[in-house]
Amino acid sequence: MNAERNGSSTDTLDEYFEYEAEEFLVSLALLITEGRTPEHSIKGRTEGFHCPPAQSSQPPTTKHECSDKLAQCRQARRTRSEVMLLWKNNIPIMVEVMLLPDCCYSDEGPNTEGNDLNDPAIKQDALLLERWILEPVPRQSGDRFIEEKTLLLAVRSFVFFSQLSAWLSVSHGAVPRNILYRVSAADVDLQWTFSQTPTEHVFPVPNVSHNVALKVSVQSLPRQSNYPVLTCSIHTNLSYYEKQMKERKLHQHSESSTAELCGTSSPQRVCGKQAWTVIPEGLLNVKKTPEFTSSIRNLKLYPSTGLGSDFAASQSKIQCYNAAADSKTQSHETAVRTFKSLSLVDSRVSNGHCSHQSTGETNPLIGSLLQERQEVIARIAQHLIHCDPATSPVVAGRPFNMRETSTPTPKAYRSTYEDESLLRKGKETSPVPTVNLDNAIQEDGGEGKTRAIPEMPRLNPRAPVNHCGRPSAGEGNPLIDSLLQERRDVIARIAQHLIHCDPATSHVNGRPFKIHETSPVSSKIFRSTYEDENLLKKVKQPSSVSFAKSSFSLLEDSSKSKLKTPDTPISPRLDGESKASLKLQARRKLVLAKPSDAVQNAFHQTSNKTSHSFTNTHTSSSCVKENKSELLDKLEMMQSDYVQKDQITNRIKQCSNFSSVDEQICTNKLKERTVVSESNNTGTLNNLQIDKCRILEGTKKATVMQASDSLHKNELKCSDKDSKKPSIYEQNTQLISIENYLNKDHDNFKNKNRQDKTKAAHDENEEPVGLDFQSTSQKKPTEDGSMRCERLKNPDVQRAPSLKHTNTWRKHNFRSLDGTSTKAFHPRTGLPLLSSPVPQRKTHSGCFDLDSSLLQLKCLSARSPQQCINRESDPESHGKPFLSSSAPPVTSLSLLGNFEESVLNFRLDPLGIVEGFTAEVGASGVFCPTHMTLPVEVSFYSVSDDNAPSPYMGVITLESLGKRGYRVPPSGTIQVTLFNPNKTVVKMFVVIYDLREMPANHQTFLRQRTFSVPVRREIKRTVNKENSQQTEERLLRYLIHLRFQSSKSGKIYLHRDVRLLFSRKSMEVDSGAAYELKSYTESPTNPQFSPRC
């Protein structure tokens, strides 16, 4: 607001206005011109940098600094100068919003700067949407008046729901793109005409200065059901093209009927279908003048048919996409240039950008190929957005239109294994994942369908293909050949990019499996991305391999029966019993087991064969070559001994000394690969550092694989061959001090479990001490394999999920409810610290426990007690009267007045501070000021009454609003809503006041107390007796203290601060008693107002 002036009359008139008149006019003009800036988003538009903030109560997070390099800033500066010049000369201001055709008014076309605005061609071609008139009028007088911010809100609402905003929202910022804003004097001769009779809206008239008010009106074009087709004065001959389009539609209709007989399952595209596409070279900006140009290249938005179809956005196919990252700029710009090399309009439409096309040609294949390439490029951009930004794209620096030798539609894309030595040793054909092209490409016709049937012949890549599979009239056209070749190059590059884009994709260098199917299956059957899962598989006979619960089978060569170990497992998404989520952990060296161990590949066997439990062993790049050769020797030995089931079983039995074979599979949770080792005798895998597993109660020492402290995630899996169903136990928390438990027997673990149960039954108010997290237990699910896994008594494994909760409560029990590091729960009571005030429970000592977690050094007084007295631990306390431990005795506490006055006047040192409270302050009366959201500093104190919780005190500082404070009406209602850190309402204070008699330069205060009074059913009593009982039994629940002052002109302000008292004890706690809340408002009486200092 303006500063107060010396003159009393001028001060009375000028003090109220929040804006200068010129600044307010500029804000309105910028809101009209920048309030609908197009952008590529769901909303489709945004407010520019120079628009006034929507909520003046909250300051903007980042203040925009104008730069001459930005066209939007230059245009805003020009608009500001024009508006201020017209306003100072007392000339009404006119802002016109219009659309221009896209054909001749693009970035390469004529600009609209300077004299071009007066060009008759522009006036003829432009479509006027809105005409705003900002006119100064004499000052409005009367009791009912409008503030400036009210007009701003009304104009913002109109702009938000305007026709232009609706078009931008439907098209996600694509159309319209050539938007022109013209600021000029509101002269009748300068006004452009509407194409239809406009509708007029007049806004409320606020006073903007001591003698001038502002009248704002807008005339707008009626709502259009369809987007208008704008044509310039040059390209208006459309009748010829309509005739040609009708002939094409008839021709395509006959072709579509023939295509159904040809068996093409893909939907037929009509060449006359509209397709609007936006090139993502940058943010879509509004073109107000030629300097404020958009950063994209304008494309033709004419439909490719002239059948009278509208440019309705609901019927149009609008595809907007952005560049994925800066690293993809080169390839993206090349794709954009390739896309721009051919116009989106049909080859028969002659304009300045497509004049090289012959208007006499009628070739539907060109239109379909153009549309297909358009969709391919759009899907490439979508895929690049979702691609891993850290992955180096293969297509970077390689344009899509480069000619390369590649198959048109490969059925399966091969890759190479990272470890080629394993591939050479493996004699079995490895399954090849089919690349999922759903996010990258979608093609129609026989060539575009990627079938998984090996018997399906490939189409001739040189033969042009149309929608019905018949040769068209344009076979010999070189444009068709170039388009087909370009499409094949795009497909090949998509495949290469997909292989390298996913860092988890395995590289297969071998013959792909022949996929046998009873029905045609598209390429979207399964994906070979191993992002989150590596699945354990079981082996069947060497002659056939089948995936469980899959609709296809992978047939391998019967002549090669040896098993191989792929470096990266094939992971079809199975929902069977073998699903396990195994995460990759980098830089972990894997030590392979000896060849004598039964480490085997895991696949499914057929139902008529005896099932074996095998596991895949995967090597990482950090493994040395000795380990790889050792693995290969082991695999060969395992393959040669594959039939000898009895020998393997006997060997395992010798180690386990039991009738049934029990295997330990301790799997490090890797992100991509798993290291699954099978331990069958003691001391075999002592180099592998993993968690300890205890097998049987009678077995004192089993195979132990130690894990270092740096390993955070290990997974324990126990598989039982008799039941043939593995029971998997996972450990997801950090392992600490595993070595302490290596030499403890089964009885010690039983004693530990008993101690845990005893501690768990302890009093809930006792603060948890530093218990060893290994001493807790966890119930195991009772399943088929759980009987044999009961012997796993190691509490490190059994209490895996609860380890993070049993640490010190200061680190783990404090949960963040709002995503910050704010402490939320109390260790003793378990109650939320940041919710609505709730008292702490009493302990057995009978004293009010001090919450040491809320103590802060800046608020902690040396006199404040910091510990509680425990009667049971203090032998001298039994013979003495017990005093309050939460506050000193009343005799030693020198209070000036009662507790309420001492707290409100800051005579007591706070015991602690609770951060995160906020309050919304508002007022209503003859006018409604802006509601302000302000922080509240909340503290609590020590009290003298035993076990009585201290009320909270909150202080709302108003100094941030200015030296005068928060302006309120002379009389009305003040509303203060208090929120806790969880944004839950604690209390809503409503205070009714009347300060119309308050003179200027005076001050006063109001205090409202809210008491909880017991409800009395007996009404027959004297008034004096009732008042005396109420004063004795009523409890103060809430209090608000308001300070008021008046300025020299008599305006009323809330100044300095607002002080609150609210109880920590919620009313719901005393739900058993019948209480009601009663409020009393008090103010000074003699004198009621005092002069300002």
From Swiss-Prot:
SMART domains: DUF4210. Residues 895-952 are annotated as: Required for macropage invasion. GO terms for cellular component: nucleus. InterPro entries: Atos-like_C, Atos-like_cons_dom, ATOS_Transcription_Regulators. Residues 979-987 are annotated as: Transactivation domain 2 (TAD2). Residues 746-763 have a biased composition (Basic and acidic residues). Belongs to the ATOS family. Transcription regulator that syncronizes transcriptional and translational programs to promote macrophage invasion of tissues. The protein contains 2 transactivation domains (TAD). Each of these domains may be required for transcriptional activation of a subset of target genes. This is Atos homolog protein A. It comes from Gallus gallus.
